[in-house]
Regions:
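A conditional alpha-helix N-cap/helix-loop micro-motif detector
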Residues: 184-188, 309
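Metal-dependent phosphoester-hydrolase catalytic domains
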Residues: 2-144, 201, 211, 321-342, ...
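Residue-level marker for buried hydrophobic side chains located in beta-strands
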Residues: 157-158, 343
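Structured beta-strand-rich core segments of catalytic domains in phosphoester-bond hydrolases
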Residues: 104-154, 202-301, 305, 394, ...
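Proline-aspartate-enriched helix->loop->beta-strand connector
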Residues: 188, 193-208
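His/acidic metal-ligating clusters that form di-metal
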Residues: 277-284, 291-295, 307-345, 349
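Acidic/histidine-rich helix-loop elements
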Residues: 162-185, 236, 270-271, 303
Length: 453
């Protein structure tokens, strides 16, 4: 049997259970059938909620889920149109039913821990008949050498739109990518191999539609705490064979951080709710005791929606100003933006768009990390996504890691693969699992930040 078509014993064990009800899915061979977790409730805050926390967002449960063979199906009617993808439908449809809340996180601590080296070897074994992923290098801005801080170690952050499985197979139309290359039983290994190769301390993902059956159990066993927020009306649910809604996920390594507060945001535009979301968490670094606010988001896609993306970005920035101004215990007051901030996301916006200018000129003092790869330190990469669809070839810079430049410094970044490495068929492909490239940087707290925390 082709090893790329079997699930390793370890990975299949990790994908067996999660909290809540179960839904049948394609059986793994060998190994037990995985169970999808039930829906989760969005909470307005954890431990230290407060300013900047938006309305709670219901987590949709696939209603009337049925099975075709053994793959989950969430029927959404006979329509083959672009359901849930427009502003008007977000406004006109009634909100999804509010699920019963779950107890606060986290049962992850009870899971047996997995050796990441062993899991990486199993991924490599399962992928041995596929071409190798593009080899990428860590680049140190301005020729600075690698720095190691004994009492202030670097924090590795990864940003990645991993491509929702339902969209890759059913809607996105990657005409130069063979359907076999998008097979989830193979593609999940490529995604996990990328994560395990770089082992981020903080992982921000978009288009996650296999959170409960894959990413949450696997990453929890590797020592991560995970949070997930689905889009209110995910386009994945318009695909006949789907695994539930897609959304944003945020993971952090429990050995490095403790959680102070969480905000689940449904972004608004012109005071009206939209279909895009964000997760914002305030973390406490165990080594230094310093706080770090991390946000993950995914703004409205497609050309023609620039004004909505700008409004969504403005709404997110307002929330972040409130959240990063929250006082910690013992403080009498806090200045706006007092907590250092990292914002990761697929903004679906080129640097020429207004939403990019909003972030770069924000009072929060944000800078885009990947500008530091350029010779002048002011130019974004030529692309973070490169795909071919029926409408043509698209090579764009849409993904960003923003950071508070007065309080944080970027030590190194993962370079961008060349056109030759990506290949003539572009992304996704047999050797890369998504149409978006992962972004990764090491950051550290400045010894003397411009603003006290």
């Amino acid at each position: 049997m082709n090893p790329a078509r079997r699930c390793s014993a370890l990975l299949s064990q990790l994908c067996v259970t999660s909290r809540g009800g179960s839904t049948a899915r394609r059986p793994l061979s060998p190994g037990p059938v995985s169970a999808l977790g039930g829906t989760r409730c969005c909470r307005s805050g954890v431990g230290g909620g407060g300013a900047g926390v938006k309305e709670t967002c219901p987590q949709p449960r696939p209603s009337g889920a049925s099975t075709t063979g053994t793959a989950p199906v969430c029927p959404m009617g006979r329509s083959s149109s672009r359901l849930f993808g427009t502003f008007a439908q977000s406004l006109n449809r009634a909100p999804l039913a509010q699920p019963a809340p779950y107890p606060e996180e986290n049962p992850d601590q009870d899971l047996a821990q997995t050796d990441p080296d062993q899991l990486l070897r199993e991924c490599e074994e399962a992928l041995q008949r596929r071409p190798a992923r593009p080899h990428r290098h860590l680049v140190y801005p301005s020729g600075t050498a690698s720095r190691r801080h004994k009492h202030n170690p670097a924090i590795r952050i990864m940003q990645w739109n991993i491509l929702a499985q339902a969209l890759g197979e059913g809607k996105d139309g990657f005409i130069r990518c063979p359907m076999d290359a998008l097979n989830w039983q193979e593609r999940k290994y490529l995604i996990m191999e990328e994560i395990l190769t770089y082992r981020p301390d903080i992982l921000c993902l978009q288009e996650v539609d296999h959170y409960y059956d894959t990413f949450q159990p696997v990453l929890a066993s590797l020592g991560y705490h995970g949070s997930f927020l689905a889009k209110p009306w995910s386009p994945c649910l318009d695909v006949e064979r789907n695994n539930g809604p897609d959304g944003c996920a945020l993971f952090y390594r429990r050995s490095r951080f403790s959680l102070q507060a969480t905000a689940y945001l449904r972004l608004s535009a012109m005071m009206l709710p939209t279909n895009q979301v964000a997760i914002v968490q305030t973390l406490i670094c165990r080594e230094t005791g310093q706080r770090l606010c991390v946000a993950v988001t995914h703004l409205k896609a497609r050309s023609g929606w620039e004004r909505m993306r700008s409004a969504q970005g403005a709404d997110l920035l307002r929330s972040l100003r409130g959240i990063t101004s929250q006082r910690s215990s013992g403080q009498t007051e806090a200045a706006p933006g007092a907590v250092p901030l990292v914002v990761c996301g697929d903004f679906n916006a080129e640097p020429s768009e207004d939403v990019y200018r909003r972030f770069s000129s924000s009072a929060l003092g944000l800078n885009s990390a990947y500008k530091l790869l350029s010779a002048d330190g002011q130019t974004e990469p030529a692309y973070t996504t490169w795909k071919i669809r029926p409408s043509g070839e698209s090579c764009s810079t849409l993904d960003y890691i923003w950071y508070t430049q007065g309080a944080l410094s970027v030590d190194c970044l993962l370079d961008i693969p060349t056109e030759e490495q990506i290949g003539p068929d572009r992304l996704p492909s047999y050797h890369y699992p998504s149409d978006h490239l992962s972004l990764l940087c090491d950051i550290s707290f400045r010894d003397e930040p411009h603003r006290l925390m």
